[in-house]
């Protein structure tokens, strides 16, 4: 009888352990479910991609956190070129040509910059993708510039990119951080 009691006690302990470890409070939610809880103060290297036909469009970036800082007009100044991430310029890899604002962008790798404004942003696709921050940015290398209006959203702690596509041969590149979202429509 003691062996059976010990076995039942072990089973109950294991079940309790499993059920308590799978329950998450809101403070335990991960930025990426494949990573441990996000407690880092660093800008995490991140990527996003989406399929356009049989090919994938990809964005590589570093994802800074808000961390109780003033972002717009503070950490990220208004009316200045920004890498729209951290560290290296955000890169956009296109397996095929797309059009943004009726400007054809051929297949290749590009940098994605923005100029945040209080009511309007400028999104820039630039030929020189391999650069640190915006210190090497050269307007002469711009492929296209698009004016967009920022949208208000719920708080997002870490900067995130999204690529949304549709069956209509169109899509959007979106950047979300703090309480703002910008979207750039494209066609392929």
Where are these regions (language model features)?
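Short, surface-exposed loop and linker segments with low hydrophobicity and enrichment for Pro/Ser/Thr
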Residues: 6, 106-108, 113-116, 161-169
């Amino acid at each position: 009888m003691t062996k059976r009691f010990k076995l039942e006690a072990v089973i109950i302990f294991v079940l309790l352990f499993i059920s308590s470890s799978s329950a998450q409070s809101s403070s335990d939610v991960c930025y990426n479910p494949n990573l441990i809880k996000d407690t880092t103060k660093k800008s995490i290297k991140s990527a996003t991609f989406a399929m356009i036909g049989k090919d994938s469009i990809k964005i590589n970036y570093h994802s800074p956190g808000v961390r109780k800082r003033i972002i717009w007009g503070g950490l990220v100044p208004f009316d200045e070129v920004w890498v729209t991430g951290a560290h290296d310029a955000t890169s956009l890899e296109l397996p095929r040509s797309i059009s943004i604002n009726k400007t054809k962008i051929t297949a290749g790798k590009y940098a994605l910059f923005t100029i945040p404004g209080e009511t309007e942003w400028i999104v820039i696709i630039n030929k020189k993708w391999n650069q640190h921050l915006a210190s090497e940015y050269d307007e002469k290398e711009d492929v296209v510039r698009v004016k967009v209006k920022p949208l208000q959203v719920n708080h997002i702690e870490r900067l995130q990119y999204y690529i949304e596509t549709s069956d209509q041969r169109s899509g959007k590149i979106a950047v979300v951080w703090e309480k703002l979202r910008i979207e750039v429509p494209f066609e392929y």
